[in-house]
Amino acid sequence: MTTSAPPPETIGEPAQTPQPGMEAGPRKTLRVAAVGDLHVGETTTGGYRDLFERVGDEADVLCLCGDLTNYGKTPEVENLLADLKLCRIPMVGVLGNHEHECGQPEEVSRMLSDAGVRMLNGQAFEIEGVGFAGGKGFLGGFGRYMLSSFGETSVKTFVQAAVEDANAIENSIRMLRTERSVVLLHYSPVVDTVIGEPPEIHAFLGSSRMAETIDRYDNVSLVVHGHAHRGQPEGATHRGVPVYNVALPVLKTLGDKPYRVFDV
């Protein structure tokens, strides 16, 4: 049985939707910047002031794709927020695995939310007619090498966590009634963008389950993620939805900018 999802929070001018999935009026391009894997530490101060000051000149929205800190410690988040407060545009974000290391991901999420970042974990937001959905995602492998729920209880528990994360992402996409949407993740939904990492660890870098979820929806314009520091900058789902790895180490191979900007 399918239940209707609550409408997403709208930021800025609300998009008029006379029928599900269609916007009224002229189509306006939204400039979406994205970056992940800043890995701010306890001794990192002022390292990203330029990023947050500059991004508002080139983009309308900033997506933060997780691993913003090294261990999810409160002093690390405070150092991040000291720079992040300089950002002049709306921000949407997800946590990464590093934010879970100290066992207080809820506190990290709260601190970021209090600083104005719209945190995605099964939620959805709409900014000037473009939807934003997603979550951290999970690992488990890709294609025929994806781990299946078979054998030991511990393996089944692991796979169930991946399934639940994919379901949360699907719920957030389902909330949106925009014809254009951006999905934010930390883990990769496709193998394309993790190539370059040792093949032995590909299963720990993402899961095809997320791509399968994304491909069920026609209104997803692009996907951004982080996590794979030595991966490739671009890939696509089976249906051709563009997927971009915006981990900062990957962005550094493309040029000087500490973020990437997309027209949506």
What are the residue ranges of the model-derived segments?
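Active-site-proximal beta-strand elements of phosphoester/diester hydrolases
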Residues: 29-39, 129-141, 182-184, 242-248
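Active-site-proximal segments of metal-dependent phosphoesterases and phosphodiesterases across multiple
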Residues: 80, 147-149, 176-219
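Active-site neighborhood of phospho(di)ester-bond hydrolases with catalytic His/Asp-centered motifs
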Residues: 34-36, 62-67, 91-97, 118-123, ...
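Binuclear metal-dependent hydrolase catalytic cores centered on His/Asp/Glu-rich metal-binding motifs
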Residues: 115, 130-178, 203-208
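N-terminal active-site segment of His-dependent metallophosphoesterases
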Residues: 1-90, 100-103, 155, 159, ...
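Metal-dependent catalytic neighborhoods of phosphoester/phosphodiester hydrolases
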Residues: 43-48, 68-85, 95, 100-115, ...
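Hydrophobic alpha-helical segments and helix pairs
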Residues: 102, 108-140
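Binuclear metal-dependent phosphoesterase catalytic core
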Residues: 2-29, 126, 208-221, 229-264
